[in-house]
Each structure stands twice: as structure tokens, then as C-alpha cells.
Amino acid sequence: MWDPLLNEFPESVHGFRCMLAVKYLQLVECTYSPDTLGYDLIRDLFSVIRAKNYVEATSRYHNFYSRLEGSSPSELRQPIQQPCGCPYCPRHKKTILDKQTHQSEAQVVSDV
């Protein structure tokens, strides 16, 4: 967790609350598998908290809230069935690591 003797203290009370919220969400995030809806919703909350201005944060929160309201509590721990196009998701890192490195890919060379 955050150690106030080793790290700088936030300049405002709002910054302090955001820092505590991020630390709490990091602990909650560990309880969800990376391929679940709950994990995605927690990642969305990170983006809401870390938004730089009010308009951006409000927009992100409305998107988060509509996704949360459209799902039941039992769906939060179930794997997401729709594919995501993001190359940075933990779900995609798993598939990249599954590829064996010693396999060379064939190239088609035309005869001259």
C-alpha cells in the first residue's frame, strides 16, 4: 500500500481521495480474472479517477455507469464473450505468449 513517508503527499484533499481510491481499486482488481466484465469495469473506474478535467471524467463516468447498470452481479465474474480489439488488454497478452518462438513463418518467393 502507499507509504506516506516514502512518497509525496498529494497537494489537495481531492488528490488524496483519488489516490486512496486508486489504491483500493488495485486491491479489488486482484480479485477478478483479467477476462471478466468486473475487471473491465474496474479499469474503467481507473480512467474516471485519473481523468484530467471534469468534462472528461463525467463522460467516462456516464459510460461506466451505463455498462454497470446493464449487467447483473453474477455477470461481473463471468468471462466476456465479445472479442476486444485492444492490443494492450491482458486477454491479448495471453495469446501472444502462446505462440512458440522457435517456429519460423514461411515466405512465398516467386521464381524469376
From Swiss-Prot:
InterPro entries: Gemini_V2, WCCH. The keyword Methyltransferase does not apply. It is found in: Host cytoplasm, Host perinuclear region. It holds the Pfam family Gemini_V2. Its main location: host cell. GO terms for biological process: negative regulation of gene silencing by regulatory ncRNA; symbiont-mediated suppression of host innate immune response. One of its GO terms (cellular component) is host cell perinuclear region of cytoplasm. Keywords: Host cytoplasm, Host-virus interaction, Inhibition of host innate immune response by virus, Suppressor of RNA silencing, Viral immunoevasion. It comes from the Viruses. Interacts with host SGS3. Through its interaction with host SGS3, acts as a suppressor of RNA-mediated gene silencing, also known as post-transcriptional gene silencing (PTGS), a mechanism of plant viral defense that limits the accumulation of viral RNAs. This is Protein AV2.
